[in-house]
Amino acid sequence: VDGDYRCFFRLGNVYRQGIGPVLEALGERYRLLLLSGDNDREREKLSAFFAVDDMRFGQSPTDKLEFVGTLPTSGHNALMVGDGLNDAGALQASAVGIAVSENTSVFSPACDGILQAEHLQRLPRFLRFATGANRIVVASMVLSLLYNAVGLSFAVQGALSPLVSAILMPLSSISVMAFATGATRLAARYTGVER
């Protein structure tokens, strides 16, 4: 009133609870890129987690889609994490798309996974678990190949009767499944995904 201010409002972005430690943990293992539809007012605050050249502000949904689409041509696999409809195209174009949702019963864009917002801090653990699960799949295949190679060598030599071969064949499958199940449970406990 008459040049005398009685109050003022300061507007700013509010980030999800626990996002700082999540970005720090992910930044230790992966290159992090930020694609935001917002203006660059938060650039300084976000520079603690993202390199200056890895932050892109004012991005439209099409800009995000095009940027994520170019990553495979430069030899990068993108895991896109988004929380809005404006991220839908980029989520679908990425190698792995994870939608962060407050409520899983509402519409979520086409993606590979939906993560409840309250569990966002577990994302680094889920990614470590996924890496371990890939190793378990490879180890299971190697175990199966070794088991069958040994069994085949005995069978070719005539050292196994048809009855023993018939018994060993399902045991091969059972042992590989038991290994995969046990190793997956151990990996889940080790990474903190399962308690």
Question: What role is predicted for each listed range?
Answer:
Residues 1-139:
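Conserved ATP-binding TGD loop and adjacent catalytic N/P-domain core of P-type ATPases
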Residues 111-195:
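Membrane-embedded transport module
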